[in-house]
A protein has these predicted regions:
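Catalytic zinc-binding patch centered on the HExxH motif and its immediate surroundings
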Residues: 502
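Conserved, single-site charged/polar hotspot
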Residues: 1-467, 471-496, 506, 525, ...
Length: 582
């Protein structure tokens, strides 16, 4: 949407309601530059090499991203974190409370804070392209507070969240590596700014709610006001392909109950002249054309705003008809004439940049209105606020403004759910000794991200060269494998566990964790029959008899995988012993 409220229709793209709407990719305006600077106030990692990069609000981690010789380099603290053709800086935990990063560049994104992940790629001209891969609800954090405000009723903020979510996915761009940009043509995404608690609540509480038409995502336009009547896209764009999604409706609540600062009134009292000198001068100029000489306006006798600009409009008018009494050199004379309503703005009667004229009789004369701040398509933001103040729910408000669209539940993960990690958890464990260093990479030469004590809970992600990649206290890092005891594994979906029968190819050891440094549980001879349950990095978690532990993948030959029903196994072992009697 442009600064004056007129949307630019770049592409008409449809996305199915069966899609996953959990994330959106936003191209950020960083300027034509080959380098940007970052300050990280949270736990991040580089997806390409799983190196941790951690900062805090009290002690931000400074980093630089630069393009040189066709490669991108991420550096921090005087050393290179990663260099490659692409860099993806991922958050460990998507929760808002887990921190953010701040971007410093030459474009509009300068000094803005961002949630989600950042992807860095190289444009054809050698400059950086930066894409914010962000949970959709968090993307809306950078839209809703600026389209409305924290003081608005919560139900109107929910309306804005749903409309903005629909608009974003209705405008996505196929074939590009991003869905939408942060420009004002596409809602003007402004990143993350703490403090808009009610606006953010509206974004989260409408997670997974979107407007659809025939199971596809439409372009859901919205604007400040409609001036008392909604419009059709053809009124603005000149073609009618989107008209079936919208309808012309009178909206008295928008006009009479919404912000009166979004219109100008010309109050006419019959039998008198107007208080608006520009209007009086306009009438005299038109009367002079008829009379043939200069005239003096004595009074306005009748006024009417008429002639719909478009079919079926009742309040978007093109012409003004008047009957006035003027004084001439030879006496008084009644004069009737009409003129284009657009002249009211052109000749200074009205001074604002509104879009629509209409009028109505009053007990003493007639009022002419100049209104509609925006395009009039879809939801009126001031109208939504007024309806919410009257007690309407966001569903009721959206039904009025988007009557030909359907509120639909879609797949969208809530980024504020507990432990909204960007990585799949393979197992759960705890540290088995004190003063354990969590390091930024898989060796003792990497920076320590902090020390932890015995019993500290960890979420296991992977195993690399004897080191375990894990999350401790919200930070992603590495710990040598013998310092972690693996305790539990995530429950399989619907208790359907994928397993396989296998055997060892040489003598090896069953260990307590996926690391050659871990303690040996028992020695296994060549050809030992085992059952494989899980895998972590280069290790399998297996069972042999009554024992379980980890064996290196390279020491095992596996058979076909199959599914076992854990519920059925437990039920068969329990029998009828705990079932209620009839």
């Amino acid at each position: 949407m442009t600064a004056d409220g007129v949307p630019k229709l770049k592409r008409d793209v449809r996305r199915s309601v069966d899609s996953d709407f959990s994330f959106i990719n936003v191209k950020l305006s960083v300027g034509e530059t080959a380098s940007v600077r970052l300050e990280l106030c949270g736990a991040y990692y580089v997806a390409e090499n799983m190196r941790a990069v951690v900062g805090s609000e009290s002690s931000p981690r400074t980093a630089a991203v630069t393009v040189e010789d066709g490669k991108i380099t991420l550096s921090s603290g005087g050393s290179t974190v990663y260099r490659g053709s692409e860099i993806t800086l991922m958050r460990v935990n998507y929760n808002e409370s887990a921190g953010w990063l701040q971007l410093f560049c030459s474009g509009n994104a300068n000094e803005r804070k961002y949630l989600g992940n950042l992807v860095f790629r190289i444009n054809d001209d050698g400059t950086l392209r930066v894409i914010n891969n962000i949970p959709t609800a968090h993307y809306l954090y950078g839209i809703v507070p600026y389209e409305m405000s924290e003081s608005c009723p919560i139900e109107s903020l929910k309306c804005q969240a749903v409309a903005s979510r629909t608009y974003a996915f209705g405008f996505t761009m196929p074939g590009d590596d991003y869905d939408i940009t942060d420009s004002f043509n596409y809602q003007g995404y402004r990143g993350y700014k703490p403090g808009y608690e009610k606006c953010m609540r509206a974004c989260v509480e409408t997670t997974g709610v979107i407007l659809s038409v025939d199971n596809e995502i439409p372009l859901a336009f919205y604007g400040a006001t409609n001036g008392g009547e909604t419009a059709l896209p053809s009124h603005l764009f000149g073609y009618d392909s989107l008209d079936p999604l919208y309808e012309i409706r009178l909206d008295d609540i928008d006009f009479y109950e919404a912000n009166p600062a979004c219109r100008q009134n010309l109050e006419i009292t019959y039998g008198e002249i107007s208080d608006n000198e520009a209007f009086n001068a306009l009438l005299c100029r038109e009367a002079k054309k008829i009379v043939g000489s200069s005239v003096r306006l004595i009074s306005i006798l009748e006024t009417n705003v008429n002639t719909p600009k478009f079919e079926n409009c009742e309040r978007n008018m093109a012409n003004v008809d008047v009957r006035i009494l003027v004084g001439t050199g030879s006496g008084e004379q009644e004069v009737s004439f009409g003129f284009s309503a657009d002249r009211l703005k052109a000749e200074g009667v009205f001074t604002k940049n509104y879009k629509m004229y209409w009028g109505e009789p009053t007990s003493t004369g007639y009022n002419i209105y100049f209104c509609r701040y925006g395009h009039g398509l879809g939801m009126s933001q001031y109208g939504a606020q007024a309806r919410a103040r009257e007690g309407q729910t966001y569903q009721q408000v959206l039904k009025f403004y988007y009557g030909k669209m359907k509120l639909t539940d879609v797949c969208e993960l809530n980024p504020e759910r507990p432990f909204a990690y960007s990585l799949n958890i393979k197992a759960y464990g705890e540290f088995n000794t004190t003063n354990v260093n969590l390091r930024s990479g898989p060796s003792a030469s990497f920076t320590s991200l902090g020390k932890f004590n015995t019993g500290t809970h960890v979420d296991v992600i992977n195993a690399v060269n004897g080191w375990i990649c894990c999350i401790a206290d919200g930070k992603l890092g590495y710990v040598r494998g013998d310092y972690i005891d693996v305790k539990l594994f995530p429950s399989p979906i619907a208790a359907q566990q994928r397993v396989c029968e296998a055997k060892t190819t040489e003598a090896t050891a069953l260990r307590t964790s996926p690391s050659q440094y871990a303690a040996e549980i028992v020695s296994l001879s060549e050809g030992a029959q085992i059952r494989v349950w899980f895998e972590i990095g280069d290790w399998y978690y297996v069972r042999i008899g009554h024992r379980s532990g980890f064996v290196e993948k390279s020491k095992i030959i596996i058979g076909d995988w199959f599914i076992i029903d854990l519920h059925a196994i437990v039920s068969s072992q329990i029998g009828d012993g705990i079932r209620p009697r009839p």
